[in-house]
Amino acid sequence: MRNIQILFIIGFMFAQTTVEGIPKSYIHSTSNRVMKAIMPDIDVDQLLLEDKNAAPGTPFRYGKIFDVDYSLNNSGTWEVLDDGDKIWRLEIHSKYAYSIGIEYDYFHLPEGAEFYVYNPDQTIIHGAYSHLNNQQDNNFHQTAMFID
C-alpha cells in the first residue's frame, strides 16, 4: 500500500494544469490538409531484444526518443478561421509505436492561447494547456497518448 501512496503523491505533484475547452478545429470548419511529421520506423522487436540484453540495473526504457525541430515557423499548417482566430496544426505519425509522448525544449504560450494534443479520431483530448503551463526553464512534457 505504501508504494501506491507514494506513486499517487508523486503523480499529483507533477500533474499538468489544464483549462476547460475544446480545440477550435472541432467547432469551426477547417481544412483536412495538415502537414504530417513522419517519425522514423520503430523496430519494436529490436528494442525488446536490447532491453532483454541490457546490463542489470539499467533503467527501464519507456520509449524511443527522436530529436526533431518542429516549430510554429518551420512546420505545421496555419489556418485563419472565419472569426479571424488563427490555428496551427501538425500531425505526428510513428508507425508501430504504442504511444506518443512529446517533450518540448522551448514551450511558451501567451495569455489567451490554448494548446491541445488529440488523436486522429478526436476521441482523446489532452488540454487545453495555457500560459499557466509555462515553466521557468521553458520545458514542457506532454503526457503519452496511446494509439491504435
Task: Label each PLM-derived region with a short phrase.
Residues 16-148:
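Domain-level representation of secreted and single-pass membrane ectodomains enriched
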Residues 1-21:
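Bacterial Sec-dependent N-terminal signal peptides
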